[in-house]
Every structure is written in structure tokens, then in C-alpha cells.
From Swiss-Prot:
Alpha toxins bind voltage-independently at site-3 of sodium channels (Nav) and inhibit the inactivation of the activated channels, thereby blocking neuronal transmission. This protein is weakly toxic against insects (ED(50)>2 ug per 100 mg of blowfly larvae), but is inactive against mammalian sodium channels (rNav1.2a, and rNav1.4). Belongs to the long (4 C-C) scorpion toxin superfamily. Sodium channel inhibitor family. Alpha subfamily. This is Anti-insect Ac4. Pfam families: Toxin_3. It is found in: Secreted. SUPFAM superfamilies: Scorpion toxin-like. Has the structural arrangement of an alpha-helix connected to antiparallel beta-sheets by disulfide bonds (CS-alpha/beta). GO terms for biological process: defense response.
Amino acid sequence: MISLSLLLMIGVESVRDGYIVDFKNCVYRCVPPCDGLCKKNGGKGGSCSFLIGSGLACWCNALPDNVPIKDPLHKCPKR
């Protein structure tokens, strides 16, 4: 019970994998290299992957919750 209390007081940030996006829900292309972009944003790493409807985009592993990832319910406005 004490460990649960400590865990709640300290707080735990969860992580998730996904296509990293900007504030408009638009994916980042594979230049600059995805691994560096993902690490700069707190992820463990990343790679270039194909996303239907967007083309080549950066897929990140273990991004913190505060970094946005692609929401399939919202489209990226045309640039």
C-alpha cells in the first residue's frame, strides 16, 4: 500500500509509439532523420515508415504523453 501511495505522489509518465505530428496533426517527413527527431522529443528512437494518405513519415518509439502523435480521426489540412 505504501508503494502505491509513493507511485501516485511521484507520478509516472506513460509512453506510446506512433507517427509524431505538429500542432495541426500533420506528420513529420523523414528529413531530418526520424531517429534524431524522436529522441529530441523524448522518445527512444524512430524510423521512416509509410503511412497511407501521408507518404513517408516518422514513426517514433516510446514518446512521452505530452508529444502529439497522429490522430486518425483528424486530418492534416493541406499545406
